[in-house]
Amino acid sequence: MTTPKKAAPEPHAEASRIREGLPFPLGATRDGLGVNFALFSANATKVELCIFDDAGEVELERIELPEYTDEIYHGYLPDAHPGLIYGYRVYGPYDPANGHRFNHNKLLIDPYAKQLVGELKWSEALFGYTIGHPDADLSFDERDSAPFVPKCKVIDPAHTWGHDHRVSVPWDKTIIYETHVRGISMRHPSVPENVRGTFAGLMVDDVLEHIRKLGVSSVELLPIHAFVNDQHLLHKGMTNYWGYNSIAFFAPDPRYLASGKIAEFKEMVAHLHEANLEVILDVVYNHTAEGNEQGPTLSMRGIDNVSYYRLMPEDKRFYINDSGTGNTLDLSHPCVLQMVTDSLRYWASEMHVDGFRFDLATILGRYHDGFDERHSFLVACRQDPVLRQVKMIAEPWDCGPGGYQVGNFPPGWVEWNDKFRDTVRAFWKGDDGQLADFASRMTASGEMFNQRGRRPYASLNFITAHDGFTLNDLVSYNDKHNEANDENNQDGSNNNLSWNHGVEGPTDDPEINELRQRQMRNFFATLLLSQGTPMLVAGDEFARTQEGNNNAYCQDSEIGWVNWDLSEDGKALLKFVKRLIKLRLTYPILRRGRFVVGNYNEDIGVKDVTWLAPDGTEMSQEQWGEGHGRCLGILLDGRAQETGIRRKGADATLLLVVNAHHDIVNFTLPQVPDGGHWTCMIDTNEPSIRGQERFEFDHEYSVTGRSLLLFELQHEEDE
């Protein structure tokens, strides 16, 4: 922690320099002749605008905002231009017992700042109270924090977008590719060193070409909002690599700007759009980097703590901690709700972002008594003319009471389905009693999502995510190995449903390695042949490893970065994944617009889905209840497609066969009305199979243990 120096004499300015301005829009807004400043605070008594030199190091002026309208302090500074560096000092009561933590000695970041300059330098002066004082956070610290806080920068929003526009991929054709701005390019040989780990690095042709050729539709970036590195991590020589510690919801993190200019983000978006790829941002509106009552005063805490945060009703000194990080933003407050929706509209309208994934999204729908799908935030998103046009993805849980809300978000939202992850992992690991749940996961978990006109794509299916094992590690480790995090391997989940197949970590055993490769193919085939919206993680497509680390949040290192030096097995897996994605996009029956529920269509005499036992007959209730059942056929009859439109793949009939037994199971290929024969399109045991061989009805196909097959029904006229 840096020791603060004695504060310099306070700078001042003539009151006549600033005009009254307007209370809207919030933030610093240039009109060509000057800049309007507007800051919400319901409980402050005075606000000073602090002007700094171009380096953000010397405070030149303090100017009191002259007007207060509808809880907005505002003023207009003539002749101010883009590039102006500023911050705020906010006056008011320091009364933590009643939720107030005003301290004008602390320079504060504008919640609406569009760009930050400088890094946060940890110092005792950042805290509104005196560290080590007997009264703890009830004490009052008089040291100036300005030398240690990032400053705000007025931007020129003008940008020549040309013909750029949102890609607007339909949900049924959406395949999400989760990645990290820094992690995807740090080890890529084609990315120049000076732009590695930045938005410019993601624009490099070879990086985009890999993503485009893979066949995914949407790139989801881990948080790019300006964030704070935790003090305890810096002490250990680490950083908050993932960035789930936001401090400015309108500003990209300066570390991701190789050029130092906001235009770099816009150029990245345009490049991805040109490659026909959507840009989805992982956003963290559930908490801020200010932490609990013992945290620093950086922005909202010092602007109006009682308005921005949810506080304990019986003692407002303390924070409700539904985020698990120390504080929780209060989106039931109209001005906090406005800030979040303004931020979303800014990224969608000004930055051309195509969608958002909301971290711990249950918090965003919480009132004091719990989650409410009619929460003002959720309603606002559905009604907003901009936000209702972009993709909205919820991580539907948080750390508070009743936080698990999978399936309970309103229509218009897509939700991470952790039950898909857990069931599919358990099934391919060979756990008992998984068959019925596995069948449900393959068909978009209708028991959770088939309501109120929601579509199968509402279930966002994933095997792995940034949080947890990579796919390679999932089949290579029984236990986490987070020693590099320097937390005695106590961090990260112990419930991974992983299996190392006989040896912990890398091995030279060819049988184990072959089985691991097959299991990765099983996972990918399950993910990409299931109903719902699939998401894969960058590097999984070629078997990236994190060396058993399942919590790489602090690993801004080779552990956390994607390794582009592909092994032969990695190249083979990549080729297989590309085939699966192409098949998914070719056959609409794999991404139906309605849930398949086993309904019988009397007009054509078929069910939309039929569940088959290994003997080729329909599964009985008794067979569903058998705990040791691990083999299942899933017959998707294309004649039951709801549209009736005939186009290539639209009316294909497909049969998926899964066998999680360790031994071969003979599976009888079923008869289908109107005749035909079966062609094997995918066999995870023989990845080279491409439909070369035909099989008649009632043929007993020997399904290798721990493998998945995909058959297509063909007729003579199809050949």
Regions of interest found by a model, annotated:
Residues H352, Y367, E373-A538, F542-A543, ...:
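Conserved alpha/beta catalytic core and glycan-binding cleft of carbohydrate-active enzymes
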Residues N36-A38, T174-I175, S217-E220, N276-E278, ...:
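Beta-sheet entry/capping signal
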Residues T2-Y177, R182, F199, T507, ...:
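Carbohydrate-interacting/catalytic domains
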